[in-house]
Amino acid sequence: MPRPPRLAPIPLSMKGSVYSAVLDRLAACPGETYPLHVGDTYLEPATSCRMEDLAVAEHPGMHRYAPPQGIPALVDAVVERLRARTGVPLERANVFVAGGGTSGLACVVGAIVAPEDEVAILAPHWPLIEGHVRMAGGVPVDVPFFGAVDSRESAVAAVETALTPRTVALYVNTPSNPTGHVVPRAWLEGLVDLARRHDLWLLFDEVYEDYVYEGEHVPGLSLAPERSFAVHSCSKAYGMAGNRVGWVAGPAAPVAEALKLSTHTVYAAPTAAQLAALRVLRGPGDAWVEKTRAAYASAGAAAAERLGVPRPHGSTFLFLDVAPRLDGRGLTGFLEDAADRGLAVAPGPSFGPYPTHVRVCYTSAPPDVVRRGIEVLAGLVGR
């Protein structure tokens, strides 16, 4: 008798979209909606760096495949940028252009994580990192960190407690999605020392590096280039999420292995999107970021003040504990009540063991829409 088809176990162990539970309900809302659930921007990319600004006459071959590592001029621009920001003498072999930061990080994880290996993840964390580890057959280990530690010593102790003989890497996202925290230099130096003592890889998710409002962003590569990977994204830096372009940097040998995985999944990042990324790096990108950073900082401060929580130090998010406002339906009921009022926020369990939290993105819609959405949320939490 033939064996019936079956599904592989790894995707069955992974979560689907973190938003699907509320979006159908939101779609049924008859009034204005406030999509504060997704980490995106309402702004268009810089003028001259949009898809409409690219022409075949100027860029013959823009609809053909790019080299798997990336368009050479873009690879060079990334190397130049990273050298300036980190002080590390990187070369082309240390970098590849990915189909977005998400794809790049997945390929790095696939290059360094073997089945049953563990990856310590500072939590709350970006939702998809757990899936990356599971795709490699590894085990994600949440480390309560943001909001749970308050010094270099407690930061190091929190991570060290979570390590086992199977731990191979530590994932650090700063500025943080979802908390808006920026990890201080002294804490990062402590984590680097810990990684060296335990011979761990360091995965630095730095896609919000340009959006720091208080404190400083410390590039991970500048602290431990021999064991660190840094992931960056045009999605967050330059408002190009739909283009799917980012880059990975790290030690040449494992970067080459990660590039193999990228080649066998997306082959290469979209050529036209890479051309737009090159334009933004060589042209108006810095000016766009300066203006955008000021707008984001203002929006974050206003949202935090209205909700009665501390201002974010970076990224584009607030992470709220709504436990006092939950009834017997738990967080699901809170999300349903929000959706019935036109508001979508992201559920806390997507970011780790946070069953009473929600995440708010204060840049995903124009400021007036965000303000009205924050008013709805303030009413729900009794502010």
Q: Which ranges hold each PLM region?
A:
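Helix C-cap/helix->beta junction micro-motif
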Residues: 29, 136, 197-198, 341
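Short beta-strand
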Residues: 33-35, 231, 308-313, 349-350
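PLP-dependent enzyme catalytic core of the Aspartate aminotransferase-like
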Residues: 80, 160, 340-344, 351-383
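Conserved core segment of the aminotransferase class I/II
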Residues: 226-297
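Conserved glycine-rich beta-strand-loop-beta hairpin in the small C-terminal domain of fold type I
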Residues: 278, 293-304, 309-323, 354
